[in-house]
A protein has these predicted regions:
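Alpha-helical transmembrane segments of multi-pass membrane transport proteins
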Residues: 1-428
Length: 428
């Protein structure tokens, strides 16, 4: 059954079938041709896979990100980031990172962050003399903060599967996200200084004040979301609803940049993305069911434990596995398949689930940055028109190195659980 499922999945992907349908076809084929399980289990597993109130947060944050893009909120975020950062050497590239960090604090998606912020900043970076390869690498690296800085779609999936607090996971991603963002900014500064481009200029307080006044309502959006979650005012799902309502009010009544027709178009495009994401999660649960029927979970765990029983060693094994999977499959498809297998093993070893959740999110992001088919890498390459050889070897390896360093720090040091324990108290 496993062989039929995997072969069917590979064939579907080779023929260009969208990942959601590829997973659904492969899972259905595996059950039909390789088992005696009744076919209604396909529908049953699909709906059980998405039957969680917490999963409502995902389509809500997708809609919030779409509203931000169409309503002029993302543009104002970029303008504000530019006002406070563009005076630095390498300021245009640093602005890309800073704006991505702010946008990530609402969207929860790496792909949405790359598209929304990269679409604005990439032309400016190219005008300033940055190479297409460097521009693609920085856009991908900065956009990948979407699943790390709260709210994070990947962490919502982790929380739904494991039952761990999504709010704690969100807060646990703040420090790693800021470390990565600051590291990328330093790399931008070094690159610009070494190549003598993007000289920056004089810091102008009046420009910053004007940008701040114009973007204050946009900047309040991530503050309300993160502050509300950290303060216990609302759950992750409620935060998604607040983000949608707030973004809509600001876009329609404050900035007056969204008409009724625009809103309908936003709903239409966001609905397509919502449906695809939920289909990926639902069909992935069929894979988990097949793995359970075949006893693959225990076989994989036994194999890993035969290599090492050290939690640190197991972390690195899982990271390597997640990176390989992430090169070929979106994290939303990989997590529902892999987590039910891996999570009980780490829980039995007493590993902190805040640490495990953040490391999983970082690992899937790393897979999205890694060739041959990392989704973040290809999105940014499409935006810049760069080629693989110009992007990966000179620049993307440094971005990947930064991500790896932060993952190692999160494994060796209690970085992911420090802030959640400070805000919510130690997890029981």
């Amino acid at each position: 059954m496993i062989q039929i499922t995997i072969i069917t999945l590979i064939c579907c992907l080779l023929f260009g079938v969208p990942i959601a349908f590829a997973i659904g076809i492969a899972g259905t084929a595996g059950l039909y041709f390789g088992s005696t399980a009744p076919m209604f289990m396909v529908v049953k597993q699909f709906f059980e896979g998405i039957n969680s109130f917490s999963y409502m947060a995902i389509p809500l944050f997708i809609l919030a990100g779409a509203i931000m893009g169409k309503g002029g909120i993302s543009k104002r975020i970029v303008n504000f980031a530019s006002a406070i950062l563009s005076w630095l050497r390498g300021g245009t590239a640093i602005t890309t990172v800073g704006a991505s960090m702010i946008f990530a604090a609402v969207s929860g998606s790496g792909a949405a962050t790359i598209s929304a912020i990269g679409g604005i900043t990439v032309p400016e970076m190219l005008k300033k003399g940055y190479s297409r390869g460097f521009t693609a690498a920085i856009s991908a690296g900065a956009g990948s903060l979407g699943p790390i800085i709260p709210p994070s779609v990947d962490m919502i999936v982790f929380g739904c599967i494991t039952g761990f607090s999504i709010s704690r996971l969100f807060v646990g991603g703040i420090i790693p996200g800021f470390i990565i963002g600051l590291s990328l900014m330093i790399y931008c500064y070094i690159y610009a200084k070494k190549r003598n481009i993007d000289y920056g200029g004089k810091f102008r307080g009046k420009v910053v004040w004007a940008a701040f006044k114009d973007s204050i309502w946009a900047l309040l959006m991530p503050i309300i979301i993160i502050g509300g979650v950290m303060g216990g005012a609302f759950t992750a799902t409620e935060a998604g609803a607040v983000a949608c309502v707030y973004g809509l009010i600001v876009s329609v009544f404050v900035y007056k940049s969204m008409s009724f027709k625009d809103f309908i178009n936003v709903l239409r495009s966001a609905s397509v993305n919502m449906a695809m994401v939920m289909m990926i999660i639902g069909f992935s649960s069929i894979f988990s069911y097949i793995f359970a029927l075949e006893g693959m979970g225990q076989k994989i765990v036994d194999f890993m434990l035969s290599i090492t029983t050290s939690p640190t060693g197991l972390f690195f094994l899982v990271i390597a596995f997640m990176v390989v999977i992430g090169c070929f499959m979106e994290s939303l498809a990989a997590l529902p398949i892999i987590l039910p297998i891996i999570y009980p093993m780490f829980a039995s070893l007493g590993v902190n689930l805040n640490q495990l959740g953040v490391v999983f999110a970082l690992s899937t992001v790393l897979g999205g940055l890694t060739p041959p088919v990392g989704i973040y890498l290809f999105l940014s390459m499409n935006l810049t028109g760069s080629k693989m050889r110009d992007t990966v070897l000179p620049h993307m390896l440094i971005v990947i190195g930064i991500m790896l360093l932060v993952i190692v720090l999160c494994i060796l040091l209690p970085i992911p659980q420090f802030l959640p324990d400070l805000v919510f108290g130690a997890a029981t």
